[in-house]
Amino acid sequence: MTQHSRDTPQFYLTAPSPCPYLPGRQERKVFTHLVGDKATDLNDLLTHGGFRRSQSIAYRPACDQCRACVSVRVIANEFRPSRNFRKVLARNSDLVGEQRSAVPTSEQYSIFRSYLDQRHRHGGMADMTVLDYAMMVEDSHVETRIIEYRRRNLSNGPNARGGELIAVALTDVLSDGLSMVYSFFDPSETTRSLGTFMILDHIARARRQGLPYVYLGYWIEGSKKMDYKSRYLPQQRLAAAGWLRVDDEGHTAPEPQE
């Protein structure tokens, strides 16, 4: 094998399968492996081009005659929470987010298992075992972090570590932002809007770290599962001509070239 072939990623195309988001459609994906010394740089490059990471795989939809999946990233420094978002932040003011290395725990898996059983019992991840979960967290060749959201333990002071685990986010750190790979939460906490809260927290984290964007994955117009991503404005959506800006009023325009 030549040096060129080792350093050049090989891309593969999956066979058609039923689309999990739009009824009656078929999906295909193009994917490559994220391994080796250049995995971080490759992940950055591919994420900018609309790919997502799952373990050591980077993938992007490559469906015949369908372009419904649109990569979305929130412009962190310009984002201002709406009244409803501020209410979500207030409801979760008793939580503290603790960032740590991507190491799986039985405590995390317990929440993960409950979340799948209640929210996604018929989904593709429904049968994941504790070993599968460990692979999802640990099988990364890029900079990945776990953020655990716990009840604030006020008895030990305002700066104390949290108590009971409520929610978890698996997050990649990119050169220009945070990419939310997967997040889950205690499904019994029905009034907190924890999925929304974790996105808002990531936007705040990106801003504090001086990172421009929070990557949310794919927005799919007409899919109830994915429509929530359109609420975080201003944002950018990836089109054939590049990233397009969607402002607070929902108007779309090309971003100025740097």
Curated annotation (Swiss-Prot):
Catalysed reaction equations from the record: N-terminal L-glutamyl-[protein] + L-leucyl-tRNA(Leu) = N-terminal L-leucyl-L-glutamyl-[protein] + tRNA(Leu) + H(+); N-terminal L-aspartyl-[protein] + L-leucyl-tRNA(Leu) = N-terminal L-leucyl-L-aspartyl-[protein] + tRNA(Leu) + H(+)
GO cellular component: cytoplasm
GO biological process: ubiquitin-dependent protein catabolic process via the N-end rule pathway
Single GO MF annotation: leucyl-tRNA--protein transferase activity
Places the protein is found: Cytoplasm
Keyword Protein transport: no
Keywords of the record: Acyltransferase, Cytoplasm, Transferase
Matches recorded under HAMAP family: Bpt
Protein name: Aspartate/glutamate leucyltransferase
Record organism: Bradyrhizobium sp. (strain BTAi1 / ATCC BAA-1182)
Gene giving rise to this polypeptide: bpt
